[in-house]
Amino acid sequence: MKKFDKSIAAFEEAQDLMPGGVNSPVRAFKSVGMNPLFMERGKGSKVYDIDGNEYIDYVLSWGPLIHGHANDRVVEALKSVAERGTSFGAPTEIENKLAKLVIERVPSIEIVRMVNSGTEATMSALRLARGYTGRNKILKFIGCYHGHGDSLLIKAGSGVATLGLPDSPGVPEGVAKNTITVAYNDLESVKYAFEQFGDDIACVIVEPVAGNMGVVPPQPGFLEGLREVTEQNGALLIFDEVMTGFRVAYNCGQGYYGVTPDLTCLGKVIGGGLPVGAYGGKAEIMRQIAPSGPIYQAGTLSGNPLAMAAGYETLVQLTPESYVEFERKAEMLEAGLRKAAEKHGIPHHINRAGSMIGIFFTDEPVINYDAAKSSNLEFFAAYYREMVEQGVFLPPSQFEGLFLSTAHSDADIEATIAAAEIAMSKLK
């Protein structure tokens, strides 16, 4: 049995210092029935907690670390920038370099604005969509999480789903009434919503792959249908690619599925592990943002040199060939997990999109939030705790997916499959 004495003591102290002892709810490990692991360091595909335990890491800081921990080029870039100054309140050339890469690789983006988080990106994109169209309502999908902005914290997934809170206290009714929610992958419900409210819907916001109800890919024709219905009704289509951006494909989720939105929100990977976000799209729309237009958005640390340098060094290391290798590794892990579950007769459903993998402990195909909620959460919690004992660090929520990095080796994946085999043999 692993010992967690130092993590337990650190969490006891933290609970007197921060709400729930953490700075983001899912880190409290509540849904898996254990104390959170306090991490000390990471290198490549491995992380090490303060008790000295080693883990193969599939959290990767919730997705950003696509090259694993402490990537040499990213670390050197950060050292170089820090020695010259961390922020100036004035433009720097590294902002141009990262912006050029983003514009070059993301089909929908002609102009991009850097911000400090994915939440900030989605909030800003909604304001832009409303300002550009002159409409008030937005349409989102049940179980899709787009950050903690009031307009979007309606029937959200991820941490909200994990805690069993469909909405959050503090979101005014006046805000909530302008958010229309329908089931993910249900195009007919989208069409019906436009029949009812079409003249007042500014935008549809969607994750190309729903990543905060587990990993739930779009059904064939779903994204194409959203593109068609928004164009027909004069609404904007926003892809929230904070999670899928540069994760599922070289050209992001929109390149992977061949559907181009009007606006795209980015985060995670483009910061290389530092706080960052971005939103971009058609020049005609983006030029409405101040100072070139009347729609205001600003940020003290937006485009700061540290985040821009980490993001740039992260993206330049990603090539089309990187994603061929991601596909091979992800297929290997998916097949191994499926084989282990089948061997022990454990009800399961596995979804995957590129290097994102979700395993649900249910017999039901998972195509939306209701299906995801059919998972056996008690079994997941027991499986999670056993995987920790076996030295594998997974996201501590049934409603989050696993992430792979360029640092994960075949040996890591084989060890993970072996750990899952042991865990499932004990729990069947």
Swiss-Prot record:
Pfam families referenced in this protein's UniProt entry, alphabetically: Aminotran_3
SUPFAM superfamilies to which the protein is assigned, alphabetical: PLP-dependent transferases
Chief location of this protein within or outside the cell: cytoplasm
Biological processes annotated in GO: protoporphyrinogen IX biosynthetic process
Molecular-function GO term, any one: pyridoxal phosphate binding
Known pathway: Porphyrin-containing compound metabolism; protoporphyrin-IX biosynthesis; 5-aminolevulinate from L-glutamyl-tRNA(Glu): step 2/2
Name used for this protein in its record: Glutamate-1-semialdehyde 2,1-aminomutase 1
